[in-house]
Amino acid sequence: MKRSKELITKNHSQEETSILRCWKCRKCIASSGCFMEYLENQVIKDKDDSVDAQNICHVWHMNVEALPEWISCLIQKAQWTVGKLNCPFCGARLGGFNFVSTPKCSCGQLAAVHLSKSRTDYQPTQAGRLMRPSVKYLSHPRVQSGCDKEALLTGGGSENRNHRLLNMARNNNDPGRLTEALCLEVRPTYFEMKNEKLLSKASEPKYQLFVPQLVTGRCATRAFHRKSHSLDLNISEKLTLLPTLYEIHSKTTAYSRLNETQPIDLSGLPLQSSKNSYSFQNPSSFDPSMLLQRFSVAPHETQTQRGGEFQCGLEAASVYSDHTNTNNLTFLMDLPSAGRSMPEASDQEEHLSPLDFLHSANFSLGSINQRLNKRERSKLKNLRRKQRRRERWLQKQGKYSGVGLLDHMTLNNEMSTDEDNEYAEEKDSYICAVCLDVYFNPYMCYPCHHIFCEPCLRTLAKDNPSSTPCPLCRTIISRVFFQTELNNATKTFFTKEYLKIKQSFQKSNSAKWPLPSCRKAFHLFGGFRRHAAPVTRRQFPHGAHRMDYLHFEDDSRGWWFDMDMVIIYIYSVNWVIGFIVFCFLCYFFFPF
């Protein structure tokens, strides 16, 4: 009795506590115990009274003496000055604090620490009990009374829960909040049956074999109420979410694949039965009573073998229909069959899982896609790319003759879009970093190994060809190498653009400008090397050809020999030699 009183008191305190949730990640960030004393009157006034827009308070005023831990840490980190309050889970902006010059709210109160109402969701007290059920006492069913055991077996707790959900749905018509509240009640239980059919079957002699096993102490000691599992759990633990991201433009439905030997109670559910699969579709209008009726179906079956936990493989499919609402999402659920102790499978009742409420109108696939790691996303991307190539190849072979006109047009549009995307991706690897156009006569610069097209290099080396810096790394270009294979690939894949650049290059004067080249050490008096420089072989990017080249590292020995300077010197020496010869001839032929 003492524990039951404590449990009642604890549940009563939970019912009186309301919470605030982040508008983005839907995580609990604060409770009503952190608000100021007048906040309850403020909430009632905002809901019921028709006050002017200037007098309505748009923030939640927080009590400085009862702040949440994460807010206290942020305030202490800012040394009780000024700062912003961001969500500790997703980082979204929620409010702020100001202890330097405390601003005054429109309601007349000082907003030292406040949370914005537009960035938080206030959850009323009706849904407070759905947030975190008590596990301390419910995990030990052997201390419960007989009434509790009867309610446990007959599903009385499920009816009370449905009654609470119905009240919440009537008070709050937001389908997103109701769906979230329902998600918190998903538990992997071992056995839960409807009261009427269980009691009726218990009286029949052929069910006396397995009905007493449910009320024995051995089965009652098994953990019935487990910790609530939300949809925010890790995927590898309970839910295996495999979104099929292929775009399907035809009208499709989702099928819940069940075994052929499993009879299903479909009374009151809007399902369309087929041979061994059942399709369900979300209606356009939200009906809380229908949702609760679907949720009230007993979700589990009797199990006697070890390890027969009920598991759901939830495969989220991003399927959009052309004739239905775009918010209607479909899910594919695998319900694996558990072990049975009776030879007649039709004698045991099996029902749909309560997860079928997940195809609510406001459930998005963004959180599912974020769960996928980089490896899975790359695999999906590769599969889609291979499928598109296969479809293009089949289309070229003319094997789409049996496809309808509309499907063929849709397929052509899809493949044209995919081809454009792949064309853009392939073109990025053949674009020069200077002119941002495809390569025309590409050259690789040494020693930085950056590749540029010929017009760009000649333009850069116009003023100073002997000390031209690389436009990317600013390294002095000592020599350039022509890339034959890259040039041929560019000419093959981008013929029109290549020819256009070629015509413009031939018409311009840049073809007469020199390519960049650095001075080379010419050993006149430093002595020639007996051994040749080591010959190296490098694999250039973009699939360029291999090239054997000498070691052109800078060498301090010997004199620097510049070809341009040599030409200048030769011309100047010729004039000097000619002048000397002229003077010598004048001396002999015209003596004084």
Curated annotation (Swiss-Prot):
Cellular location(s): Endoplasmic reticulum membrane; Nucleus envelope
SUPFAM superfamilies under this entry? RING/U-box
Query: Gene Ontology terms, cellular component aspect?
Result: endoplasmic reticulum membrane; nuclear envelope
Membrane topology type, per the record?
Single-pass membrane protein
Keywords from UniProt, A to Z, are: Endoplasmic reticulum, Membrane, Metal-binding, Nucleus, Phosphoprotein, Transferase, Transmembrane, Transmembrane helix, Ubl conjugation pathway, Zinc, Zinc-finger
Task: Give the main EC class.
Answer: transferase
What GO molecular functions are on record for this protein?
A: ubiquitin conjugating enzyme binding; ubiquitin protein ligase activity; zinc ion binding
List residue spans of RING-type Zn fingers.
432-474
Interaction with ZIC2: annotated segments? 281-489
* GO BP terms in the entry: adult behavior; norepinephrine metabolic process; positive regulation of proteasomal ubiquitin-dependent protein catabolic process; positive regulation of protein ubiquitination; protein polyubiquitination; serotonin metabolic process
- What does the record give as the reaction this protein catalyses? S-ubiquitinyl-[E2 ubiquitin-conjugating enzyme]-L-cysteine + [acceptor protein]-L-lysine = [E2 ubiquitin-conjugating enzyme]-L-cysteine + N(6)-ubiquitinyl-[acceptor protein]-L-lysine
Q: What is its main location?
A: endoplasmic reticulum
Topology check: give the Extracellular ranges: 586-592
UniProt superkingdom? Eukaryota
Which InterPro entries is this protein grouped with?
RNF180 (IPR033263), RNF180_C (IPR045790), Znf_C3HC4_RING-type (IPR018957), Znf_RING (IPR001841), Znf_RING/FYVE/PHD (IPR013083), Znf_RING_CS (IPR017907)
Q: In which pathway does it act?
A: Protein modification; protein ubiquitination
The UniProt record lists the EC number as 2.3.2.27
Which residues are recorded with the post-translational modification Phosphoserine? 230
Q: Which residues cross the membrane?
A: 565-585
What job does the chain carry out?
E3 ubiquitin-protein ligase which promotes polyubiquitination and degradation by the proteasome pathway of ZIC2.
User: Subunit composition?
Assistant: Interacts with ZIC2.
Enumerate the PANTHER family for this protein.
Answer: E3 UBIQUITIN-PROTEIN LIGASE RNF180 (PTHR46717:SF1)
What is recorded about the domains?
The RING-type zinc finger domain mediates polyubiquitination of the interacting protein.
Please report the name of this protein according to its UniProt entry: E3 ubiquitin-protein ligase RNF180
Q: Which organism is it from?
A: Homo sapiens (Human)
